[in-house]
Amino acid sequence: MAAASAPVPGPGGASSTARGRIPAPATPYQEDIARYWNNEARPVNLRLGDVDGLYHHHYGIGAVDHAALGDPGDGGYEARLIAELHRLESAQAEFLLDHLGPVGPGDTLVDAGCGRGGSMVMAHQRFGCKVEGVTLSAAQAEFGNRRARELGIDDHVRSRVCNMLDTPFEKGTVAASWNNESSMYVDLHDVFAEHSRFLRVGGRYVTVTGCWNPRYGQPSKWVSQINAHFECNIHSRREYLRAMADNRLVPQTVVDLTPETLPYWELRATSSLVTGIEEAFIESYRDGSFQYVLIAADRV
């Protein structure tokens, strides 16, 4: 993504940007988003990451392990609930990585909208490869780079502040790339054109995203609430497929994860970490106006 206003230390104390400085936001909207995520410190993100040091900025999938949760009446229940939410979020990241295709230790991956870097760490641990992350938020990039140094993988995992629509990666050099709940901050044709540029022919692009359902007619009131809460612009499923086709990204797999993510939201709504947006997600998933999907596409 794009920029903020202060240098971001990278490995060895260097800036995390290619030019040794943080570029200015390209638009006022990018500046607003950088400010939003620089100031974000929700317990729902930080306390879940504290479970095992993987800090995510996406939601979870899969069945809730009620046996692991145990009795809601005992003193350790909230900690177990937090651990279970985190397990479901990591399961989502694993599912995304499952769809990246063949990746070797000599390859480079790109996480567009990398947050605090949890998925990047998981990708390196699985494939042994280099993982580059881009974000609008200087605070997120600094956090991700600090975590990489603590883990001793900063020679392979790096976050930088830059515009995901205008990255420094050379044409055709990236094996696979993804947007994990970050494509709602950009124009789809613009972001897919950039992925298509830096992906090698035969490379894989994956997105996991919430999208409004064209069969509903228009974005529902719940989708509008989500847009307002996160200062984003949720696209329709149809828009994703059309923009991919226009940019030489041919979908190979489309998975509707809506039934898989609803249990996560229903559990999160019972925790002390609620943010006020849980009802909008739950109701929009239930009424069919909002969907949670994975799309994996090959660069041709």
UniProtKB/Swiss-Prot annotation:
One of its GO terms (biological process) is terpene metabolic process. It catalyses: (2E)-geranyl diphosphate + S-adenosyl-L-methionine = (E)-2-methylgeranyl diphosphate + S-adenosyl-L-homocysteine + H(+). This is Geranyl diphosphate 2-C-methyltransferase. Catalyzes the SAM-dependent methylation of geranyl diphosphate (GPP) to yield (E)-2-methylgeranyl diphosphate (2-MeGPP). Its EC number is 2.1.1.255. Keywords: Magnesium, Methyltransferase, Plasmid, S-adenosyl-L-methionine, Transferase. Its cofactor is Mg(2+). GO terms for molecular function: C-methyltransferase activity; magnesium ion binding; S-adenosyl-L-methionine binding; S-adenosylmethionine-dependent methyltransferase activity. Residues 1-24 are annotated as: Disordered. The keyword Methyltransferase applies. Belongs to the geranyl diphosphate 2-C-methyltransferase family. The keyword Signal does not apply. Pfam families: CMAS.
